A protein has these predicted regions:
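Catalytic cores of DNA base-excision repair glycosylases
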Residues: 3-214
Length: 214
């Protein structure tokens, strides 16, 4: 389906999810930075469960900068790729040195170990600073082609396509809104299409409607 005015159809989605806080239960930008790194290839739920113990021991970058990577293992040993993540976290703590110096621009964030474009966009969005890109996580990679706002499976390609459609002042909202849709409604299997606010334009739903009943 060719859509001329995507913002018209995205408005209900943005109203539902656009301002919702990220599922990581962080209390400040330092915690957000560390939890975003830990959550890569892991679940937000898992990171939330271990965060309290970790931050009780390492309440700031200053404390973390004094640690060795192996010191972190007892707190994050259940996290996927914990060995590399321990190295990255200690290295960035020594690089930034204090919480007030945590960057909030895309170029500066992606220079940090363990921070890619998606993670940087999450930090920018949650910090409330001007968007420079759009969050494209695994949920967005699945949902965006389903509803028809993007094609392909490459994150940067999907991001560029959505950026070309959505005005910049909505970039911080739209990626996370699509992600929440994927988490709650547009699941990998048995998506709840009948209650989805995007089913009016959704390619997946419209194709599903054409299939003969079994």
């Amino acid at each position: 389906m060719m859509i001329q005015d995507w913002m018209k159809y995205l408005e209900p989605l943005l109203k539902l999810y656009g301002k919702r806080k990220h599922p990581l239960n962080y209390k400040n930008r330092y915690q957000l930075l560390i939890m975003v790194i830990l959550s890569a290839q892991d679940s937000d739920k898992h990171i939330n469960e271990l965060a309290e113990n970790f931050f009780n021991v390492y309440p700031s970058l200053e404390f973390l900068a004094k640690a060795l990577p192996e010191d972190l293992h007892q707190y994050i040993g259940s996290v996927r790729n914990f060995g590399n993540k321990s190295e990255w976290i200690v290295k960035l703590a020594k690089t930034i040195s204090c919480d007030d110096k945590i960057p909030t621009t895309l170029d500066d964030l992606i220079k940090l170990p363990g921070i890619g474009r998606k993670s940087a966009n999450v930090i920018i969005r949650e910090s409330g600073t001007k968007a420079e890109g759009i969050i494209v996580d695994l949920h967005v990679i699945r949902v965006a082609p389903r509803i028809g706002i993007a094609t392909g499976v490459q994150p940067e390609r999907i991001e560029k396509q959505i950026m070309a459609i959505v005005p910049q002042e909505k970039w911080n909202e739209v990626g996370m809104a699509i992600s929440f849709l994927g988490r709650e409604i547009c699941r990998p299997t048995n998506p709840n299409c009948n209650i989805c606010v995007m089913n009016v334009v959704c390619n997946y739903y419209n194709e599903l409607a054409k299939r003969p009943a079994i």
